[in-house]
Amino acid sequence: MVELTITGDDDDILSMFFDEEFVPHAFVDILLSNALNEDQIQTQSVSSLLLTRLDFYTKNLTKELESTIWNLDKLSQTLPRTWASSRYHKEAEQNDSSLYSTESLKSSKLEYYLDTLASAVRALETGMHNVTEKLSDLDNENNRNTNVRQQLQSLMLIKERIEKVVYYLEQVRTVTNISTVRENNTTSTGTDLSITDFRTSLKALEDTIDESLSSAIDNEAKDETNKDLIGRIDSLSELKCLFKGLDKFFAEYSNFSESIKSKAQSYLSTKNIDDGMIS
């Protein structure tokens, strides 16, 4: 038998037969009409070559078709009993019930492969769902941590403000008790404070500050300052806002505040330092 190899020209010849507009009898008519004008021996040679090619292509196409049919038939065959049994038990365990009848033991290989692929896809979906849930839990935990941190910061701020309020109230109590301490040498027992007592307390405190400033001027060098005393005067000046709404007390404390700040500025003017230590 003559062996033939498929070349580019052979592909072109073969592709002609796959043309949707190909007309077999028209092809034969053209072939025979051309043969009438050629030598008979040459015509027989061409015909023999065409028949040989036809036989070759037919056998190859038949072989490929048989192989394809065999593969499809193989996929449609019933699974071996061990494969089918393991698949049945696995699916029964996953679904926690016997949802598959004995007919499932006769599944084909193709169905087995498709079911295996479907199981893998479901497992992937479950994994993605678990990952999504974990990410969501982490986000919620981060949000909770952020809220706790913000609450802690708020509580710290509240604590700081409360401590400042307590400090100012202690300062006010100290101021209002000065006159009582001077007269009775004891602290106030919480009795009502008159405007006269309040004025007396402020006057006594102002005299004490004035004496401290005078002593500092006499005993300090030009480049030294009593920062504790200046800080104390600044703190007492800040208490003025606490007396707003108490007209008589506010007026008395305003005069006191302006007086001690003026004395502090006079003290600082004797020093070789920059201005602005008193707010």
UniProtKB/Swiss-Prot annotation:
Q: Which Gene3D superfamilies did the record assign?
A: 6.10.250.2790
Q: Which UniProt keywords apply?
A: Golgi apparatus, Membrane, Protein transport, Transport
| Presence of the UniProt keyword Membrane in the record | yes
Task: Give me any GO biological process, just one.
Answer: intra-Golgi vesicle-mediated transport
Q: Does the keyword S-adenosyl-L-methionine apply?
A: no
Compartments in which it is found: Golgi apparatus membrane
Instruction: List all disulphide bridges recorded for this chain.
Output: none
**Membrane topology type:** Peripheral membrane protein
Tell me, how does this one assemble?
Component of the conserved oligomeric Golgi (COG or Sec34/Sec35) complex which consists of eight different proteins COG1-COG8.
This molecule's function is given as: Acts as a component of the peripheral membrane COG complex that is involved in intra-Golgi protein trafficking. COG is located at the cis-Golgi, and regulates tethering of retrograde intra-Golgi vesicles and possibly a number of other membrane trafficking events.
In its UniProt entry, what is this protein called?
A: Conserved oligomeric Golgi complex subunit 7
In its UniProt entry, the species of origin is given as Saccharomyces cerevisiae (strain ATCC 204508 / S288c)
